[in-house]
């Protein structure tokens, strides 16, 4: 047991020389581990005579405590040095120039909406709005689509609680506006609409704008004039050819699809329209014997695709900044 002091001094020297926490733990294992040098001394106490065992045990325990104290002090020093180095590495240099902010811009669909709404404002239309979660009455019944009507199969609808729906078109805005206003009525109704559909040219959520003009003496000729003027101004082509093909919509009579002749000489469908059905006027408490009106609807996403040359509708909704910043 005469070498206790020598082992302690060697241990304290090794602790002082440890360069990091890993090396420090290796030193601890060397002296206090299962087969450590001080541990081995404790194992040998049983070989001593009883009168020597007590004094030898006290000496070894004092050496062990001294080693642990040196170890703990060194560990605290290394932890403090590690923290200081970490803080220095993460420190903010306030003298460095700041990062420039990147200017944002409107989404291409929003740009298209604003452009179209602006064109119709110059023709005397005002912009109306309404809820996206709509009752069955305003989404269907007020538009001459009663329960079990076959026209309901034309649209795949998202139903929510209390028999409400995510509106399948912005026509409910027109129904609500007619219910709360008397003619003359001249509005456009843009907004998000929802249908169960998704591919390169369809999305379960997309944007529509519908227009409505109700007044005494409004005719299909007025409808053709307004729509044709709008399309020529939007596409910036005074010679743009527009045609109206007979079609069917339950809320209009007569009804038509709207086509334009593109630069490749092909007819392209861009919307639907028609004279407001007398039943729709009656449901809104507007006298169909006194007033007539027309309505039309266009897809804002489709018009944005045409204006900006985008072939896949889904690009508008993927939030790819490399794509969107082209329109800033």
From Swiss-Prot:
Cofactor note: Binds 2 magnesium ions per tetramer.
Compartments where found: Cytoplasm
GO molecular function terms attached to this record: ATP binding; magnesium ion binding; phenylalanine-tRNA ligase activity; tRNA binding
Catalytic reactions of this protein: tRNA(Phe) + L-phenylalanine + ATP = L-phenylalanyl-tRNA(Phe) + AMP + diphosphate + H(+)
InterPro entries per UniProt: aa-tRNA-synth_II (IPR006195), aa-tRNA-synth_II/BPL/LPL (IPR045864), Phe-tRNA-synth_IIc_asu (IPR004529), Phe-tRNA_ligase_II_N (IPR004188), Phe_tRNA_ligase_alpha1_bac (IPR022911), Phenylalanyl-tRNA_Synthase (IPR002319), tRNA-bd_arm (IPR010978)
SUPFAM superfamilies, per the entry: Class II aaRS and biotin synthetases (SSF55681), tRNA-binding arm (SSF46589)
GO (cellular component) term, any one: cytoplasm
Domain of life: Bacteria
Xref: HAMAP family: Phe_tRNA_synth_alpha1 (MF_00281)
Subunit-structure text: Tetramer of two alpha and two beta subunits.
NCBIfam families associated with the record: pheS
Stated name of the protein: Phenylalanine--tRNA ligase alpha subunit
């Amino acid at each position: 047991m005469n070498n206790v002091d020598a082992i302690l001094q060697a241990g304290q020297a090794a602790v002082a020389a440890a360069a990091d926490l890993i090396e420090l733990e290796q030193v601890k294992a060397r002296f206090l581990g299962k087969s450590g040098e001080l541990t081995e001394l404790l194992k040998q106490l049983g070989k001593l005579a009883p009168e020597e065992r007590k004094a030898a045990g006290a000496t070894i325990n004092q050496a062990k405590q001294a080693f642990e104290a040196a170890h703990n002090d060194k560990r605290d020093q290394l932890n403090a040095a590690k923290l200081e180095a970490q803080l220095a590495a993460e420190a903010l240099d306030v003298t460095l120039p700041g990062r420039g902010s990147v200017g944002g811009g409107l989404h291409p669909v929003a740009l298209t909406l604003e452009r179209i709404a602006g064109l119709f404002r110059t023709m005397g239309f005002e912009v109306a709005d309404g809820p996206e979660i709509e009752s069955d009455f305003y989404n269907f019944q007020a538009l001459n689509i009663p329960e079990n009507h076959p026209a309901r199969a034309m649209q795949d609808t998202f139903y929510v609680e209390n028999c409400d729906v995510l509106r399948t078109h912005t026509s409910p805005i027109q129904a609500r506006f007619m219910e709360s206003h008397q003619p003359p009525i001249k509005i456009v109704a843009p907004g998000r609409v929802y249908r169960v559909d998704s591919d390169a040219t369809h999305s379960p959520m997309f944007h529509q704008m519908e227009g409505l003009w109700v007044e005494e003496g409004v005719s299909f000729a007025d409808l053709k004039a307004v729509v044709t003027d709008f399309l020529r101004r939007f596409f910036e082509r005074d010679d743009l050819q527009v045609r109206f093909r007979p079609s069917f919509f339950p809320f209009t009579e007569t009804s038509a699809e709207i086509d334009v002749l593109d630069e490749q000489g092909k007819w392209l469908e861009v919307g639907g329209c028609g004279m407001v059905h007398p039943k729709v006027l009656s449901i809104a408490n507007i006298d169909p014997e006194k007033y007539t009106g027309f309505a039309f609807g266009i897809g804002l996403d489709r018009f944005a695709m045409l204006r900006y040359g985008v072939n896949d509708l889904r690009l508008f909704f993927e939030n790819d900044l490399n794509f969107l910043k082209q329109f800033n």
